């Protein structure tokens, strides 16, 4: 563990050399920590000492992003593994667990949606989303897909082929809706199908998005024939229709390739100085079953290193059956052999990585690269608009440089009850959701019936900058968490509360703070009684408005969540013997108080920690 006073290693050559000598020349994983003991970066190597030493020997060749990281490194730790493949697997798990700032290669790009299957629920849902739920670890995400229209079309066809849950919540309490009557839903809302049987259907659907449509058809065909032999013609016809639907879906995905029995992925990128747009085509049995898109920081490394990291992150969350036998890459990867070994061990079958030379495979990579070029052009146009807004905002507020990291704050409550705050972050004009934060207001004077937005904002900014207040020696301007601009949702009063809260800390000399009032979209500066003379539609003001609206949305959603949770708890708290853990189990199983009220004693008793006696007590409470 590093000392808060520990010097950065680059400023202490003797300690740096001593530390590097302690690192073995074996495979493993290394951690870079700053002076506050925060993990900056996690990496892996087949020779730990050589890899870590390279950061300091080739300091001037690292590029801006890694150079900034190395300047902050105060301690280096490592874990030795037996093999390179073990190092890669351990690195993937640790990055997923800690999410270090300099490991975040892929940008949070909302334009690429995912398809989610909620395996965490007894009756899984299937839906398209642009946000991954971190709290539901059993859920499976496929994507991100570049063609939203095709994804919706595919999901629509899948829902016509298989009887699936159509609604997130039931339309009626005591009977199924029309979807059940016409055969599009098996009656999930009334539990007319067992969870185990429904999950079997979902497994079939998952095979489609895993690129295993042909395998699914091969599985269904003997089932259809067996049903016909047993004179169960209705079931045979239903399976026949499913097979025909799957064949229709497959025909729309064909690509021209030899040896179309081989499953393969093809990956390529196109980059400028800022952005690297990556396309990954998934081809199974000669069909293009998925076209995934990623946007990365072009400064994070050379093309081969970026492609390697994308593949590592992508396959880290995949099922072994989803990993193809062959992966075509645009350029040589720095650790291709290590990645191939890891994927081979994980899949249980040989996985080959290669830069294609044969005409058909080389043409496939060229096609993927062309698509990446189109995505880069779109990203550049969007980036240019954001750059214009940043430049306009810098001129409007007379900032010393373009505001790359902007933070927005808002308070949400109902007359002081369930008071919360939000912090949202825009980087280069785009939401950076990995930096969003919620705050529960702890001020004892803010209670139901007694609201105080000024005191709440003061508390939040003091908590936000606690690290810098307690350690004033920190080089805050080089800290990646230091904002170029802070925007407060409100007027002069809210702005003054924040400024007063930070006065005397020494931070204000390096902080740019403004407020944006809702009524007339007026911008206030500290110490000024009148708002700036601005046009509400100019690019810089529009950027602040987007930030303000996002901070408001994020605060309100958290407030509603807290209020709903409190109301849930207050009802269940009245039932004797129903403690916190049992309440959690009930809510996880039934999702709401209404569903718990409608459940029978037998259904309640199936929940973990709820026996027959307590189940009867719960039922009696709701049915006096």
From Swiss-Prot:
Listed InterPro entries: DisA/LigA_HHH, GIY-YIG_endonuc, GIY-YIG_endonuc_sf, GIY-YIG_UvrC_Cho, Hlx-hairpin-Hlx_DNA-bd_motif, RuvA_2-like, UVR_dom, UVR_dom_sf
Keyword annotations from UniProtKB, A to Z: Cytoplasm, DNA damage, DNA excision, DNA repair, Excision nuclease, SOS response
Broad class of where this protein is predominantly found: cytoplasm
One GO term describing the cellular component: cytoplasm
Domain of life the protein comes from: Bacteria
Gene Ontology MF terms: DNA binding; excinuclease ABC activity
Location of this chain's protein in the cell: Cytoplasm
Classification via Pfam families: GIY-YIG, HHH_2, UVR, UvrC_RNaseH, UvrC_RNaseH_dom
GO BP term, example: nucleotide-excision repair
Domain UVR stretches: 214-249
Protein's UniProt keywords contain DNA repair: yes
HAMAP family, A to Z: UvrC (MF_00203)
Purpose of the protein: The UvrABC repair system catalyzes the recognition and processing of DNA lesions. UvrC both incises the 5' and 3' sides of the lesion. The N-terminal half is responsible for the 3' incision and the C-terminal half is responsible for the 5' incision.
The protein's assembly and partners: Interacts with UvrB in an incision complex.
Family: Belongs to the UvrC family.
NCBIfam families: PRK00558.1-5 (NF001824), uvrC (TIGR00194)
PANTHER family assigned: UVRABC SYSTEM PROTEIN C, UVRC/OXIDOREDUCTASE
Annotated protein name in UniProt: UvrABC system protein C
Organism of provenance: Cyanothece sp. (strain PCC 7425 / ATCC 29141)
């Amino acid at each position: 563990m590093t000392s808060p006073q520990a010097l950065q290693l680059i400023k202490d050559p003797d300690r740096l050399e001593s530390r590097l000598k302690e690192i073995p020349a074996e495979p493993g994983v290394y951690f870079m920590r700053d002076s506050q003991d925060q993990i900056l970066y996690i990496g892996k190597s087949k020779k730990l000492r050589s890899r870590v030493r390279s950061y300091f020997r080739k300091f001037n060749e690292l590029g801006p992003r890694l150079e900034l990281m190395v300047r902050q490194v105060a301690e280096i730790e490592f874990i030795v593994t037996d093999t390179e493949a073990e190092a890669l697997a351990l690195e993937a798990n640790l990055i997923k667990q800690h999410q270090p700032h300099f490991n975040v290669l892929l940008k949070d790009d909302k334009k690429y949606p995912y398809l989610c299957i909620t395996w965490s629920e007894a009756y899984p849902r299937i839906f398209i989303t642009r946000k991954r739920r971190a709290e539901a670890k059993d859920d499976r995400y496929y994507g991100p897909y570049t063609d939203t229209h095709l994804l919706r079309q595919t999901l629509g066809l899948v829902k016509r082929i298989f009887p699936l849950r159509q609604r997130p919540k039931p339309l009626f309490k005591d009977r199924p809706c029309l979807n059940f009557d016409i055969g599009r839903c098996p009656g999930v809302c009334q539990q007319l199908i067992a969870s185990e049987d429904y999950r079997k259907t979902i497994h079939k659907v998952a095979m489609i998005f895993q690129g295993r449509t042909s395998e699914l058809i091969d599985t269904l065909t003997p089932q259809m024939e067996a049903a016909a032999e047993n004179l169960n013609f209705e079931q045979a016809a239903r399976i026949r229709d499913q097979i025909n639907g799957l064949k229709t879906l497959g025909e729309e995905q064909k690509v021209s390739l030899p040896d179309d029995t081989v499953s393969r992925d093809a990956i390529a990128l196109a980059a400028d100085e800022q952005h690297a747009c990556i396309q990954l085509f998934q081809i199974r049995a000669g069909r293009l079953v998925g076209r995934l898109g990623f946007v990365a920081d072009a400064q994070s490394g050379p093309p081969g290193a970026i492609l390697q990291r994308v593949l590592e992150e992508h396959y880290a969350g995949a099922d072994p059956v989803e990993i193809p036998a062959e992966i075509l890459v645009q350029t040589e990867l720095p650790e291709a052999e290590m990645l191939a070994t890891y994927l081979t061990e994980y899949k249980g079958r040989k996985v080959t990585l290669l830069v294609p030379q044969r005409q058909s495979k080389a043409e496939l990579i060229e096609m993927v690269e062309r698509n990446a070029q189109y995505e880069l052009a779109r990203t550049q146009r969007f980036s240019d608009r954001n750059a214009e807004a940043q430049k306009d905002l810098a001129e409007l507020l007379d900032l010393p440089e373009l505001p790359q990291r902007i933070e927005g704050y808002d308070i949400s409550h109902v007359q002081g009850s369930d008071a919360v705050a939000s912090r949202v972050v825009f980087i280069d004009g785009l939401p950076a959701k990995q930096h969003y934060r919620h705050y529960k207001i702890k001020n004892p004077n803010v209670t139901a019936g007694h609201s105080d937005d000024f005191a709440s904002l003061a508390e939040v900014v003091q908590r936000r900058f606690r690290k810098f207040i307690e350690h004033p020696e920190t080089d805050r301007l080089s800290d990646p968490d230091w904002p170029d601009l802070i925007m407060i949702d409100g007027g002069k009063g809210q702005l003054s509360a924040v400024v007063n809260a930070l006065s005397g800390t020494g931070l204000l000399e390096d902080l740019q703070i403004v407020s944006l009032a809702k009524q007339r979209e007026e911008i206030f500066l500290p110490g000024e009684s009148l708002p700036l003379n601005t046009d509400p539609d100019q690019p810089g003001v529009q950027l602040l408005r987007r930030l303000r609206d996002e901070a408001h949305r994020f605060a309100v959603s958290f407030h509603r969540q807290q209020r709903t949770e409190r109301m849930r708890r207050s009802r269940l708290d009245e039932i004797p013997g129903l403690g916190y853990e049992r309440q959690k189990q009930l809510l996880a199983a039934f999702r709401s108080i209404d569903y718990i009220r409608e459940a029978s004693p037998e259904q309640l008793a199936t929940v973990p920690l709820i026996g027959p006696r307590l189940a009867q007590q719960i039922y009696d409470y709701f049915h006096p």
